[in-house]
Amino acid sequence: MNRNVSASTMTRGQCLRSLAAGSSLLPGLLSELLGEDSGIRERNPLSPGIPDGRPRASRVIMLYMSGGVSHVDTWDPRPKLMRDAGKTVTVNEFQGRKGSFSMYLKSPQWTFRPRGKCGTQVSDLFPRTAACVDDLCVIRSMKSNHTNHYEATLGMHTGSFTFARPSMGSWISYGLGTLNRNLPSFIVLAPQTPYAGGQVWGSDFLPGAHQGTRVVPGTEPVANIQRRSASEELQLLELGLLARMNQRHRAARGDDALLEARMQSFKTAFGMQKEMPEVFDLSDETESTFRSYGLQPGSTSGFAWQCLVARRLAERGVRFVELIDTGSSGNWDAHGDMQTHAPLAANVDQPTAALLQDLKQRGMLEDTLVVWTTEFGRTPFNAAPQAAGREHHHWVFSSWLAGGGVRGGMTWGASDDYGIEVAADEVHVHDFHATILHLLGLDHTRLTWRNSGRDFRLTDVHGRVVHEILS
């Protein structure tokens, strides 16, 4: 007997019986959607996990600057580069090509000054964030594997510079689950599609429940978040019928990760309809909060909006929130003119500082790890002496961490005199990831998923926790 009855052949009696059966599931469905059934919690892939060790942080807010921020113009003062500007230097790689190249040193374009009690030097590009430097650990010895945007962006997000793999946010969701069953565990605030596209928040072979949910600043940050049904009661009736059909389908198919992920997505979506509008409703924020972030009341876009919404998501238990400031255009990729860094820095500087101060005032910075990074740096040299821009540079660049078990007011690692290569205490992207996982109580060597006959992990077969920067 064919049990697949199409809508066009379903009789009135069959339809009524299905609706009645669906309505009988409403009490159990409502309990499931609200997370009240312990058995369902055990099946829920987003249930809170148990860390391997003692976590210093319970959540992450990652600020990603797309395009490649120049380290020698922002976080890594190179006085000798300034003194020797215009002189030639021989390098072994340029624009991805190996060989011996004679290049002209290019001076930093902004002045560096000692900041805070710690005296860490930061350039004038980030005056407000620099005022928070006593809470920052600036890493000046970051290193990536690739000089192209696509591969470097993929590597910073997934640990793989060649093939699509689960993103860091997905790994953290898999390891720790969510603290709020009405919200996704991993949310990305992205006004544009970045280099490498949606792979930067994809879950790849991990269950689909762990992929990032993209929020696009605007009047409808999450598509279809508003209920289309006439009432909540009618929606519950629809969900009851759908749950019954899915459960029957699951029983016939056995284990099916895609089906489980789809079923979980309906539960999460129902919860999001209740809680997401509240996250985006900023009417309960004070005027002083709006001023500190540089956000106009009523605005629903811009990096300031992203930062304030990120704080509200973190407050509500979202494990991993990523903010991408731009996308694959109009970003920090300053080939033609380094002065394009100025408006981009002005766009992110005040809200970044406000986010750090806001988290600190609310007592959240202690267990919130804030990560600021980019895919690579920019060359301290150029092929032409009068070139106004800088090229891609993956041999060394800068990132910083704050809160969540990190020692503030310090720098770690160093580039050489000209900012060309790592001179001390290299922190590869794999080490960066291992350290972030460690701060969350996750052992990067044990957080694995078996796929195609081998165990995969975020750090592949590499990675060292940088214990020296931990508080």
Can you describe what each PLM-predicted range is?
Residues M1-S471:
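Ligand-binding pockets and gating/stacking loops
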